[in-house]
Amino acid sequence: GTLIGQDYK
């Protein structure tokens, strides 16, 4: 859900 399409937790 961040930047491009990668989700960081």
Swiss-Prot record:
The keyword Nuclease applies. GO terms for molecular function: endonuclease activity; magnesium ion binding. Its EC number is 3.-.-.-. It is found in: Secreted. GO terms for biological process: DNA catabolic process. Keywords: Hydrolase, Magnesium, Manganese, Nuclease, Secreted. GO terms for cellular component: extracellular region. Its main location: secreted. Stimulated by magnesium and manganese. Inhibited by zinc and aurin tricarboxylic acid. The keyword Nuclease applies. It is an enzyme of class 3 (hydrolase). Optimum pH is 8-8.5. Monomer. Involved in DNA degradation in the substrate mycelium. Cuts DNA nonspecifically. Possesses endonucleolytic activity. This is 34 kDa extracellular nuclease. It comes from Streptomyces antibioticus.
